[in-house]
UniProtKB/Swiss-Prot annotation:
The keyword Cell membrane does not apply. Homodimer. Part of the ribosomal stalk of the 50S ribosomal subunit. Forms a multimeric L10(L12)X complex, where L10 forms an elongated spine to which 2 to 4 L12 dimers bind in a sequential fashion. Binds GTP-bound translation factors. It comes from Saccharophagus degradans (strain 2-40 / ATCC 43961 / DSM 17024). Belongs to the bacterial ribosomal protein bL12 family. Forms part of the ribosomal stalk which helps the ribosome interact with GTP-bound translation factors. Is thus essential for accurate translation. The keyword Ribosomal protein applies. The lineage of its organism: Bacteria, Pseudomonadati, Pseudomonadota, Gammaproteobacteria, Cellvibrionales. Keywords: Ribonucleoprotein, Ribosomal protein. One of its GO terms (molecular function) is structural constituent of ribosome. GO terms for biological process: translation. This is Large ribosomal subunit protein bL12.
């Protein structure tokens, strides 16, 4: 018997944040897609603004490209930014490149980038 969409959503709702991150990564790999691309494509369609292409970006994703040499400091910075536990933050850093924060304001994204780079990480804003 196949699982219904409702069953799948309920199973995802019971997962930890790190399990969901790993699930998304596995789905991206299996299906050859990117979750960030789906959000970027869906956002203009939801807004319905044809002239929105020239508008300034208001939401940013903070992507940890690599932890660099000071991995412990980067894990501490990730914990401070996200509020994750030690294990979850370590898994996020070990899984780089990985999203640290998604859909945040430019100021929040710049602050997170600054903290991570001071800790020794390479960071991208998208």
């Amino acid at each position: 018997m196949a699982l219904s969409k409702e069953d799948i959503l309920n199973a995802i709702a019971e997962m930890s944040v790190m399990d969901v991150v790993e699930l998304v990564a596995a789905m991206e790999e299996k299906f050859g897609v990117s979750a960030a691309a789906a959000v970027a494509v869906a956002a203009p369609a939801a807004g319905g603004d044809a002239g929105g292409a020239a508008a300034e970006q208001t939401e940013f994703d903070v992507i940890l490209a690599s932890a660099g040499e000071k991995k412990v400091n980067v894990i501490k910075a990730v914990r401070g930014i996200t509020g994750l536990g030690l294990k979850e933050a370590k898994e996020l850093v070990d899984g780089a490149p990985s999203p640290i924060k998604e859909g945040v304001s430019k100021d929040d994204a710049e602050e997170a980038k600054k903290l991570l780079e001071e800790a020794g990480a390479s960071v991208e804003l998208k």
